[in-house]
Design a protein with these regions (language model features):
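Accessory RNA-recognition modules of RNA-modification enzymes
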Residues: 2-364, 369-371, 375, 383
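Rossmann-like AdoMet/SAM-dependent catalytic core
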Residues: 433-436
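C-terminal substrate-binding/active-site "lid" region of AdoMet-derived donor-dependent transferases
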Residues: 377-381, 385-431
């Protein structure tokens, strides 16, 4: 179950208002870091609760016409055996919104995430999948893993973190999920008056960098290393660009994708939403000089670096474009999920001339919203024998899984990784193979 999956409650929140406290039995975990509860027929998404508990829930959002109300567990009447004292003093109702599950033991956090992945695929794709969320190497206690942290700055120039679904800032003197090198920069002791936020990056190669926003005139470039069984290399990345925040994530994901796709010499491969070229470069080494790899990315901070990261592989090409634009997919005309686009009337876009008409392999690594129906249709039209889908949102993966099935691609393998311990976030890597034309 995910937020918004329940029918609209007549009259919105009914008799529940912000600040009300009610005692409820807690049901299953929901996608988004909540658990589901009900009070007199009203659906509640309750943070800081665990399945099977009885808690006192304080309503935090109750809007007219909303399908559910949001709440925080501010008291626990009957506790789950998996409940623990959060290690961070800033975790809990009304405090920092960065972590969702610090009140659960780490193994149970992964059970909750596993339940979410299975439920999303069942409900949105009609598939019953036997998958378990796996731990990544390192950070055995789920702390000290986050190598990139964005701190907000308050009116007094102090760095801190924001509350859940709020612009309100919580001043902090530590962040337990941050890599210790992030905190060693002294970012939380400095005066950042005049800045909106401060980014701190602790790369795998070299010293941490601190980037005030908007104060930085030139954003530093850092080096990130991948040291895997199937691929090793170093990458230039903008300190404000995208790179996986868990130190073991990039290596694990590249090895997993290569293992699933099994590239062959001479293959043509597409890396869609390519970032700085992580998967493109790994594929280029596998397909060799007789193969071809095309990386598609729109963020100029990433494409500049991708071209440098791929420079040693003449068989690669970086296409600077949004993936939908590269395929000639019309932009949506109204706000909505990428899977429910409404094409601009009368607007026709040309497919990018450097996209190959066919491909042997495709890597899809879309943003949280997913690839969407139209992009999936274009990917399927390439006729690739295999598609690897790297997903940071299980709901988007499930929707796109259904779209791929419509075009003859079946889910053949799925792995899920706890790349963000203490939070509700996770990463999935799925393999799809063409089963019909």
């Amino acid at each position: 179950m995910s937020e918004g999956s329940e029918p609209t409650v007549p009259g919105g929140a009914g008799d529940l208002s912000v600040g009300d406290e009610v005692e409820v039995e807690v049901g299953p975990v929901a996608h988004g870091g909540f658990c589901v509860a009900r009070h007199e027929g009203r659906v509640m998404f309750v943070r800081h609760a665990l399945p099977g508990e009885r808690v006192v829930a304080r309503v935090t959002e109750a809007r007219e016409g909303q399908r559910f109300v949001r709440a925080d567990a501010v008291g626990v009447t009957t506790a789950s055996p998996h409940r623990v004292q959060p290690p961070c003093p800033y975790a809990g109702p009304g405090r920092c919104g960065g972590c969702d599950f610090q009140h659960a033991d780490l193994a149970y956090q992964r059970e909750l995430k596993t339940a979410v992945v299975r439920e999303q695929l069942s409900r949105l794709a009609g598939l019953e999948v036997d998958v378990e969320v796996e731990a990544l190497p390192g950070a055995p206690d789920g702390l000290g893993w986050r190598t990139r942290v964005e701190f907000a700055v308050d009116e007094n120039g102090r760095a801190g973190l924001r509350k859940h679904r709020s612009h309100d800032l919580v001043p902090v003197d530590t962040c337990l999920i941050a890599d210790p090198r992030v905190l060693a920069t002294g970012v939380l002791e400095q005066d950042w008056a005049g800045e909106q936020s401060v980014d701190v990056v602790a790369p795998s190669v070299g010293e941490p960098v601190v980037v005030p926003v908007p104060g930085a005139e030139a954003v530093p470039v850092v080096t990130e290393a991948v040291r895997g069984d199937r691929f090793s290399g170093e990458f230039e990345v903008s300190a404000r660009g995208f790179w996986q925040v868990h130190p073991a994530a990039a290596t694990t994901f590249v090895d997993t994708v290569l293992g699933m796709l099994a590239p062959r010499a001479g293959d043509t491969a597409l890396d869609l939403y390519a970032g700085v070229g992580l998967f493109a470069r790994a594929l280029a080494e596998q397909v060799g000089p007789t193969g071809r790899v095309v990386a598609v990315e729109s963020d100029p901070r990433a494409t500049d670096k991708a071209e440098r990261n791929l420079a040693a592989h003449p068989s690669t090409l970086v296409v600077r474009a949004r993936v939908d634009d590269a395929f000639g997919v019309p932009r949506p005309t109204r706000k909505g999920s990428s899977g429910n686009r409404r094409a601009a009337r009368g607007r026709k876009l040309r497919r990018h001339p450097m996209l190959p008409p066919t491909a042997d392999l495709v890597v899809l690594d879309p943003p949280r919203t997913g690839a969407g129906r139209e992009v999936v249709a274009q990917v399927a039209a390439l006729g690739a024998r295999a598609v690897a889908y790297v997903a940071c949102d299980p709901a988007a993966l499930a929707r796109d899984t259904a779209y791929l099935a419509d075009h003859g691609y079946a889910l053949q393998a799925l792995r899920a990784f706890d790349a963000f311990p203490m939070t509700h976030h996770l990463e999935c890597i799925a393999l799809f193979e063409r089963t019909r034309t």
